[in-house]
């Protein structure tokens, strides 16, 4: 079983955004994390996904300064993203799985961009972190 850890900052105000689209963007990342944690190379008793929200102050998103932003991190302890695809991860048709369509993260990036936000990824074996930053003010 995969353990889901929710670490939410209750002080974050409602985002001026389309909630359903943001849910879709987040679920695309969570789905990938679950698939990575289900791979044969992972000890299935230790798999975990952390959903963490925090306020970020003084953020520059797409060349625009914002006094306040919300940061959503999706962290998993899976095998990591292969180095040969990490730099092109958000482009269409890029997938680390033979059965993957390569569309989920491309859609995520498009949704976050439409909300004037930023999505980034850092990955190594045992620690992959997607970070979504969205303007609040």
Language-model features, listed with the residues they occupy:
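Conserved micro-motifs of the catalytic ATP-binding
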Residues: 14-17, 96
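Short alpha-helical Gxxx[C/S/T] motif in the catalytic ATP-binding
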Residues: 104, 108
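Acidic ATP/Mg2+-coordinating residue in the GHKL
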Residues: 76
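Short conserved segment of the HATPase_c
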Residues: 67-69, 81-93
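ATP-lid-like helix-loop hinge signature
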Residues: 34-70
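Conserved catalytic submotifs in the C-terminal HATPase_c
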Residues: 3-13, 56
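Detector for a conserved hydrophobic position within an alpha-helical segment of the HATPase_c
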Residues: 112-113
């Amino acid at each position: 079983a995969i353990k889901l850890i929710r670490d939410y900052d209750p002080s974050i105000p409602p985002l001026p955004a389309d909630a359903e689209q943001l849910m879709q963007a987040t679920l695309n990342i969570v789905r990938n994390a679950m698939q990575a944690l289900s791979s044969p190379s992972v000890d299935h008793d230790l798999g975990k996904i952390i959903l963490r929200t925090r306020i970020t102050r003084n953020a520059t998103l797409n060349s625009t300064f914002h006094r306040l932003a919300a940061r959503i991190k999706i962290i998993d302890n899976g095998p990591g993203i292969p180095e040969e695809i990490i730099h092109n991860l958000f482009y269409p048709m890029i997938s680390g799985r033979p059965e993957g369509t390569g569309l989920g993260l491309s859609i995520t990036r498009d949704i976050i961009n439409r909300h004037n936000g930023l999505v980034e990824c850092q990955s190594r074996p045992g620690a992959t972190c997607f970070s979504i930053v969205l303007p609040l003010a």
